[in-house]
Design a protein with these regions (language model features):
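Transmembrane signal-anchor hairpin modules in multi-pass inner-membrane enzymes, especially those
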Residues: 1-105, 139-145, 149, 204-208, ...
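A membrane-periplasm/extracellular boundary helix in multi-pass inner-membrane enzymes
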Residues: 3, 160-166, 227, 245-290, ...
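Alpha-helical transmembrane segments of multi-pass inner-membrane proteins
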Residues: 73, 101-106, 145-174, 183-249, ...
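Transmembrane alpha-helical segments and their membrane-water interfaces
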Residues: 74-87, 99, 103-159, 196-202, ...
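Hydrophobic transmembrane alpha-helices and their immediate junctions
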Residues: 136, 213, 246-249, 253, ...
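A conserved mid-to-late transmembrane alpha helix and its immediate loop/hinge
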Residues: 222-224, 229-233, 333-371, 394
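Long extracytoplasmic/lumenal interhelical loops at the membrane interface
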Residues: 284-300, 304, 308, 312-352, ...
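Transmembrane alpha-helices of multi-pass inner-membrane enzymes
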Residues: 386-395, 400-444
Length: 444
């Protein structure tokens, strides 16, 4: 009796311990996922910048907003330590990303404001580390699902602010009435929702069973793009829609691949021809003038500033900081307080010189080729790696997204490029994982 009782109790205790361990693992996993979701939302810049940034000085940095980043950096370090071997392996496979970030930090030695460069270089390092963590921690499906969920939350929050709190969710002074959602400015909001639309479609492609959520959210995101009245965002969203269905045809109907490629080449050639020889008509078609709402005037003024420090730049993150510094003459000539270059390539040139532009250019071209190679070797992640990489280039032409500290676009690009350079196996809904370099099976 006693022996049996002891055996029963021991078995009961083992089962209880196993149950507790399982619960603890689920709890830790939930906490980790919650932290990752929080970090993605924080890096989006939504809501915090809207509330804390001075609308009369968009280039200024709120001390409170800066302090809020330190807890996030601590969380990134804790997450990175937990998966350190995988993170180091991912970094080793991505020397170009590491070199680009290190070069921005090295600009401390010739920076016009060394303390600012040091602080923002550390922020860039933490931003990039978070992108590498996402690449190391999650497979393609897990990454896309988490990014899509974060953007779905941002889309719903933006719609709520625009409808229920229009003094926050809509532009008040310039572009009055245009929706800006949880962002500070309508173009940032529109481009964010264009990226959200692409993520919703990619998440649906990876998990069609969740279409009841992703499809309506995609429609909401496209509606928010329209409400932002941003032409750049509309072009980006239209590209996402057309590109998604083009890749769908490419994957599903091999017999149509050659006609599809001819159609793409002819379309790009025609658009390029019209932009060169019918510039005014093309801009009028999308409701823009030649200056792209003053952007070309900004770029022309910045050419003179770039000529002063063409190879090394002014130091990472310093050009726009001092109102009496080198940016003074740009703002003086344009007669308004320009906050950024509104172009990622120009911004990078100002910060870290032509060397940084060349380094990132090599990184981007390699990433694009690896993304296109996925059309032959990859799985359902094809939609994201091809369209997301090209969309990043499109957005960088009108917004400062390249090598930007505390910026979600840079986090996502790093995560995507890092997985490409690491030759992450493709994601298939109904097939086992196989090595990247294994020849793909013919698609019927």
């Amino acid at each position: 009796m006693n022996s049996g009782s002891l055996t029963y109790n021991r078995g009961y205790d083992d089962a209880a311990i196993a149950a507790r361990n399982q619960f603890a693992m689920k709890l830790l996993s939930f906490i980790e996922n919650a932290i990752v979701l929080f970090l993605i939302l924080h890096f989006s810049g939504a809501l915090i910048a809207l509330i804390l940034t001075d609308p009369n000085d968009l280039s200024s940095e709120s001390p409170l907003a800066r302090l809020l980043w330190y807890p996030s950096y601590i969380l990134i370090l804790l997450l990175s330590l937990q998966y350190l071997p995988r993170l180091v392996r991912t970094a080793i496979f991505n020397p170009l990303i590491v070199i680009c970030v290190l070069w921005c930090g090295i600009s401390y030695f010739w920076s016009i404001e060394p303390s600012v460069t040091m602080r923002r270089s550390v922020a860039l390092l933490m931003t990039t580390t978070f992108g590498l963590f996402l690449a190391a921690r999650y497979d393609w499906n897990e990454l896309i699902q988490r990014l899509a969920l974060a953007y779905a939350i941002l889309a719903l929050l933006s719609a709520f602010l625009a409808l229920a709190m229009p003094e926050l969710g809509r532009m008040q002074q310039i572009h009055q009435g245009a929706w800006r959602g949880a962002w500070l400015e309508k173009n940032s909001f529109g481009l964010g929702m264009a990226k959200a639309l692409l993520l919703m479609m990619c998440a649906f492609a990876m998990k069609p069973a969740r279409g009841w959520f992703w499809v309506p959210m995609g429609m909401i995101c496209f509606g928010l793009v329209l409400m932002s009245t941003s032409k750049a965002a509309l072009l980006s969203a239209s590209f996402a829609l057309v590109g998604f269905f083009a890749i769908r045809v490419f994957r599903r109907f091999p017999v149509l691949r050659v006609p599809l490629m001819y159609t793409i080449v002819i379309s790009i050639s025609t658009i390029t021809f019209l932009l060169i020889f019918q510039t005014d008509a093309m801009f009028e078609l999308i409701g823009k003038e030649r200056t792209l709402t003053g952007r070309t005037d900004i770029w022309n003024s910045l050419v003179l500033a770039i000529k002063e420090h063409p190879w090394l730049g002014y130091g990472y993150g310093t050009f726009w900081g001092d109102p009496n510094g080198p940016s003074y003459w740009v703002r003086f000539s344009l007669e308004w307080g320009v906050p950024t270059a509104h172009n990622g390539w120009v911004e990078t040139w100002l910060s870290a010189g032509a060397i940084a532009v060349i380094l990132f250019g090599i990184l981007y071209v390699c990433s694009l080729f690896l993304a296109l190679d996925r059309l032959y070797r990859g799985g359902v992640e094809n939609y994201w790696v091809v369209l997301g990489t090209i969309q990043f280039l499109m957005i960088s032409m009108s917004e400062s997204t390249i090598l930007q500290q505390n910026d979600l676009s840079w986090v996502i690009f790093v995560a995507t490029a890092a997985k490409l350079f690491s030759f992450e196996p493709g994601y298939w809904r109904n097939k086992p994982i196989r090595p990247y370099f294994q020849p793909p099976e013919p698609r019927g």
